[in-house]
Amino acid sequence: MAPGAPSSSPSPILAALLFSSLVLSPAQAIVVYTDKEVYGAVGSRVTLHCSFWSSEWVSDDISFTWRYQPEGGRDAISIFHYAKGQPYIDEVGTFKERIQWVGDPQWKDGSIVIHNLDYSDNGTFTCDVKNPPDIVGKTSQVTLYVFEKVPTRYGVVLGAVIGGVLGVVLLVLLLFYVVRYCWLRRQAALQRRLSAMEKGKLHKPGKDTSKRGRQTPVLYAMLDHSRSTKAASEKKAKGLGESRKDKK
């Protein structure tokens, strides 16, 4: 290399920065959420909810996979797969005619429904989500318990949830009617005030008329008095004139 020529090798500092950006800034892991436990009665259906959080936008290549491990079993089998916008039900196992896709990737929902539950469905279901390029993360598991009847504990929880929702609805309705009652009451008071003002305007001309009615006799009396005074003056003047003529 000739003296004074610029070096073509990268700066050691720049190389270190590039290395640290690649090593120390990995993509955030995807996070999958499911219920811990779900309960169902024999012959009924149950929804296995699955949602996720990802640092990336929902990809067209997003995929959901459900696996099932029977109660007491050691191996898990794939029972459902969603990819390229299409759901696929695996032919292996007893769920092939009982699974229904109810999820929506745009809402980050990968839920499925299992129909016609049976005791043999007891076990653990695993939801796995891949949202390229965000594909690193842990799966989430939900345990299904099938009974002849839904357990009381589950019924109590469900009843509490329904009761809470109904309570909120009733509270909103009560608040609506209270606000409406106050508004109607205020409108009625305003209407009464406007009516009173209108009546006051109508009564004012009547008061003026009554005043004029009281003033009219007084005016007539004053007019009669002036006329009588004038007549008396004229009569007196006429009498004086006649008396002067008599003296002459």
From Swiss-Prot:
Residue ranges in the Cytoplasmic topological domain are 180-248
Question: Which topology term describes how it sits in the membrane?
Answer: Single-pass type I membrane protein
Q: Which residues lie on this side of the membrane: Extracellular?
A: 30-153
Please give the chief subcellular localization of this protein.
Answer: membrane
Q: How is it modified after translation?
A: N-glycosylated; contains sulfate-substituted glycan.
Chain spans, region Disordered: 222-248
Assigned keywords, A-Z: Cell membrane, Disulfide bond, Glycoprotein, Immunoglobulin domain, Membrane, Phosphoprotein, Signal, Transmembrane, Transmembrane helix
Q: Which residues carry this modification: Phosphoserine?
A: S210, S226, S228, S233, S243
Q: Where is the signal peptide?
A: 1-29
The UniProt regions of compositional bias labelled Basic and acidic residues, in chain numbering, are: 224-248
Where in the numbering of this chain does the Ig-like V-type domain appear? Answer: 30-143
Q: Which cysteines are joined by disulfide bonds?
A: C50-C127
Family statement: Belongs to the myelin P0 protein family.
Please state what the protein is called: Myelin protein P0
* Native source organism of the sequence: Equus caballus (Horse)
